[in-house]
C-alpha cells in the first residue's frame, strides 16, 4: 500500500479583517438513509461560514435534479447510463466500475469546493457528505467481501485509490468526522420513505453489513486503515434514530453539538 501523503494545511486568502484561516474539513459519515443529505442541508443553513459538498448522486444516476456546481452533466452522464442502478441490479458486474467512479466524482466535487465561497470566511468549515475513506473501507470492501469484486478488481481498486490519494489526498484530509448513527431498521424505513428508485430493492442484510462496518470504524474504532492519522481523528457520534427532518428542536440540538465539536478542533 502507498504511504499516505504528508498532511498539508489548506489556507484560504486573508479575510477583510486581515486574518488567514484554515478551512476545517469534516466528513459526515453514516449508513444509507441515515439522514446525511438532510443533515448537510441543515448545516449549510445554520452558519454562513459553513459550506457542504453533497454526494454527487446525479453523476451516478444520470439525473439532473438541480443546477448547482456539483451536479453539472459529464460525458459519462450524457451517455445515459444509470451506474447506481446498474450496480444494484448486477453488483458482480458493476461494483468495481461504480466504486471507482463514485470515488472519482467525490474527489472532483470536494476539490472544486475548496475554492468556493469560504474564501472570505473568518472561521470556514467545509462538510463533506462521506469521504474517500468510507468509499474504500466501508462500501468497496463490503462489495469485495460479498464477492461482488474479484481479487484482481479489489487489488486494482486499492492501487488506484492509493495513487489518487497520493496525488490529491492531502487536500482532502479531514480534521474530524461526524458519525450519524442509526440502526439498520430505521435506515430501511427511510429508504422506502425517500423513494429513490435505485434503492428500493436494498435488502436488510446489506444495511446490516454496512452498519457493522461503520460501527467497527467509527464507534469501536477497531478498523485498521492505511491512513495512520485516521486512528486518532476526532469523531462526534450523533444518535439519529429519531427523525429530525421536521423536528426543529432536534435540529437545534444537533447543531449545538456540532458547534461544540468544532470548537475543540
Swiss-Prot record:
CDD domains in the cross-refs: dNK
GO annotation, biological process: deoxyribonucleoside monophosphate biosynthetic process
Primary enzyme class: transferase
A GO MF label: deoxyguanosine kinase activity
Amino acids binding ATP: 30-38, 190-194, 242-244
Stated family: Belongs to the DCK/DGK family.
Name the record gives this protein: Deoxycytidine kinase 1
Amino acid at each position: 500500500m502507498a504511504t499516505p501523503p504528508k498532511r498539508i494545511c489548506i489556507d484560504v486568502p486573508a479575510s477583510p479583517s486581515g486574518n488567514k484561516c484554515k478551512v476545517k474539513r469534516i466528513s459526515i459519515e453514516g449508513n444509507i438513509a441515515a439522514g446525511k443529505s438532510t443533515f448537510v442541508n441543515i448545516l449549510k443553513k445554520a452558519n454562513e461560514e459553513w459550506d457542504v459538498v453533497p454526494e454527487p448522486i446525479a453523476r451516478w444516476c444520470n439525473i439532473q435534479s438541480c443546477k448547482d456546481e456539483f451536479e453539472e452533466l459529464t460525458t459519462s452522464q450524457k451517455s445515459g447510463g444509470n451506474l447506481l442502478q446498474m450496480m444494484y441490479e448486477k453488483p458482480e458486474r458493476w461494483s468495481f466500475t461504480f466504486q471507482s467512479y463514485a470515488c472519482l466524482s467525490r474527489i472532483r466535487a470536494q476539490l472544486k469546493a475548496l475554492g468556493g465561497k469560504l474564501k472570505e470566511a473568518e472561521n470556514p468549515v467545509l462538510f463533506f457528505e462521506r469521504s474517500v475513506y468510507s468509499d474504500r473501507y466501508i462500501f468497496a470492501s463490503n462489495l469485495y467481501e460479498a464477492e461482488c469484486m474479484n481479487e484482481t478488481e479489489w487489488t486494482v481498486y486499492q492501487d488506484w485509490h492509493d495513487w489518487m490519494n497520493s496525488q490529491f489526498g492531502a487536500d482532502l484530509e479531514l480534521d474530524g468526522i461526524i458519525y450519524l448513527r442509526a440502526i439498520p431498521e430505521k435506515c430501511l424505513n427511510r429508504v422506502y420513505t425517500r423513494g429513490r428508485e435505485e434503492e428500493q430493492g436494498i435488502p436488510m442484510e446489506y444495511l446490516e453489513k454496512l452498519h457493522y462496518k461503520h460501527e467497527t470504524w467509527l464507534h469501536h474504532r477497531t478498523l485498521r486503515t492505511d491512513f495512520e492519522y485516521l486512528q486518532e481523528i476526532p469523531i462526534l457520534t450523533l444518535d439519529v434514530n429519531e427523525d429530525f427532518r421536521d423536528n426543529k428542536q432536534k435540529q437545534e440540538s444537533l447543531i449545538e453539538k456540532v458547534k461544540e465539536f468544532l470548537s475543540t478542533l
